[in-house]
């Protein structure tokens, strides 16, 4: 009697034979797919489909959970997977560039740095799970063995050490800090400035203009909101309550328009990703600005981070232009 494994093997052979009609059978073999080159760097370093797919395993599991095992038939799911694979590809390319540059500059990790950035970090991750086997299972879901994960932590630490070398000469003067302070005073008030807002959300500009016309003619804002707004705040007359001026939970375009309003002023129609808004500023509450010297160190750190990021990005762009990157993104999917 044939074993279950032999029967399964026979079924798989039959499936591949059937699906190969009209195309090259070798293209259907997993090893052929895994070995497809997605990118070449420096002319001799490659990134394969298998490497990408391995690191995309976690995303695939999430998509299966959300869309079912046939997620590949869903355009939204496929688009999400493609986007994730593109991000993985970019990360792998940059990592290879970093590691080559680090090698060229003879940047390595000391024993203490390995303990801090590899062993200790690994232990921190492991503590998030009840058992070691549960942690290893999670690693496997995201495409890593323990050794590979530790290698990844080591590579990240080397890359960070290289980046610190790149930005080590970046400084911030008192004049730069004062200039930033003068143009961002609202971020350094004794308490966060707030604005009490209400809004009416509709689908089209035509509807928004009609809403604004009704308000301009003297109709009560809250009454109109309850009648026509599509937002959940309609039951409260569109009232959103007090919002901090720098609240990142709100759409930037929405907040920019709202902050231009004076107390009891109503905006013209404002378009955002959610639709068309008519916004009312009920009341602004503003607080005194802190003295420059009391916030100078914080500002210097903020400006330093921005300048370092700019130097890093320019350097990376230069390195990428020198890396002879050849992408074949059709092999991603």
Swiss-Prot record:
**Transmembrane regions:** none
Task: Name the Gene Ontology molecular function terms of this record.
Answer: peptidyl-prolyl cis-trans isomerase activity
Q: What domain of life?
A: Bacteria
Question: Which keywords label this protein?
Answer: Cell membrane, Isomerase, Lipoprotein, Membrane, Palmitate, Rotamase, Signal
Is Isomerase one of the keywords?
Answer: yes
Q: What is its EC number?
A: 5.2.1.8
GO biological-process terms attached to the record: protein folding
Instruction: List each copy of the PpiC domain by range.
Output: 192-283
UniProt family annotation: Belongs to the PrsA family.
**What's the protein called, per UniProt?**
Foldase protein PrsA
Task: Report the source organism.
Answer: Clostridium acetobutylicum (strain ATCC 824 / DSM 792 / JCM 1419 / IAM 19013 / LMG 5710 / NBRC 13948 / NRRL B-527 / VKM B-1787 / 2291 / W)
Source organism phylogeny: Bacteria, Bacillati, Bacillota, Clostridia, Eubacteriales
